[in-house]
Each structure stands twice: as C-alpha cells, then as structure tokens.
UniProtKB/Swiss-Prot annotation:
This is Fluoride-specific ion channel FluC. Belongs to the fluoride channel Fluc/FEX (TC 1.A.43) family. It holds the Pfam family CRCB. The lineage of its organism: Bacteria, Pseudomonadati, Thermodesulfobacteriota, Desulfuromonadia, Geobacterales. NCBIfam families: crcB.
Length: 124
C-alpha cells in the first residue's frame, strides 16, 4: 500500500510539471504545433531511459523508488493520450502534413531521447 501512495504522490507531481512545462512551451512557441506535448514526452523519454538503465546496472535506485518515479512521476509527466488527441485534431482540421510530422517527430525523437538516456546511464 505504501508503494501506491508514493506512485500517486509522484504521479500528481508529474501532472503538475506537465501542466506548467507544456504551458510554458506553448507560450514561447505558440500553438500551431503540439510543442508542449512533444516537450514533456521528450523529457520523459530521456528520463525513463536514464533511470531504467541506471537502475538495471546499479542498486542505487531501489525498486520502490524506481516504480514511483517511472510509473508515478513519468506517467504523470508524459502523455500519449494528449499526443493522440492533438494529432487527431490536426487531421480533423485538414492539417495532414503537420499531423504526419507530429507523429514522425514524436516517435523518432522520443526513441532517440530514450537511447540518449540509456547511453548517459551507461557512462555514469
């Protein structure tokens, strides 16, 4: 039960971080492209690569903390559902090219950020 509390608390923190970070990114770059969602997903992809690889190679992150961070915080920070909704809206609005770019950039860049996180963890 204690682990569920940690997951919930860090999940709430991740949600708040997503709200403020994506809002800031949209203020800076505008809303013509889902920049805010892309930003939080890129950060989350990097962090999950870093944390998971580091925890596999080291006992420095106990499983309870790893689950709280990855399932809770990163689960709250990142958002596949918003990515899906924003892409669907782009398609509905006739912005086919922007929707395709969003899908391709999101998938390729998130995989790349995960890989970079793994490489950083291996270098530590």
């Amino acid at each position: 039960m204690e682990q569920l509390v940690y997951i919930a608390l860090l999940g709430a923190l991740g949600c708040l971080c997503r709200y403020f970070l994506s809002g800031f990114v949209y203020q800076v770059f505008g809303t013509s492209f889902p920049y805010g969602t892309l930003a939080v997903n890129l950060i989350g992809a990097f962090l999950i690569g870093l944390i998971m690889e580091f925890s596999v190679r080291s006992a420095a992150i106990p499983p309870t903390l790893r689950f709280a961070i990855t399932i809770g915080f990163l689960g709250g920070l990142t958002t596949f559902s918003t990515f899906s909704f924003e892409t669907f809206r782009l398609l509905e609005d006739g912005a086919l090219l922007i929707a395709i770019v969003n899908v391709l950039v999101s998938v390729v860049a998130c995989l790349t950020c995960t890989w970079i996180g793994i490489m950083v963890a291996r270098a530590l």
